[in-house]
Amino acid sequence: LGAGDDTFVWDPGDGSDVVEGQAGLDTMDFNGANVAENIDISANGGRAVLFRDIAAITMDLNDVETIRFDALGGADTVRVRDLSGTDVTTVRIDLAALGGGGDGASDTIVLDATGGDDVVQVVTDGASIRVLGLAAEVVI
């Protein structure tokens, strides 16, 4: 990506990628599929990694500040690990099905704390739940 605020979009059928965000506030928008997916977001040194079990997709991210996962249906499990040391400040998880409604499937979100002493706050903000106090804010 170039300098400035950029958005990189991943859709089912795309392969694994390395994303270099560079300057500005950059976002990776990762679109899921209407199947049960396992998504794992973690740190690898100063880089962030998003792994999707369906098709063994790995997104290797540097200088990306926001990761947005749109589930689009299915009984999904999303795990956000300690993102300390990465540039990620916000992880947004949208569990709505295609078209914006619910799909009746049970989703699971697991958030890992950092290696230090954490004071975690869970607050509602309209229709969203915000988790504050971890390495990155998580908005569900």
Map each language-model feature to its residues.
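Acidic, glycine-rich low-complexity segments
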Residues: L1-I140
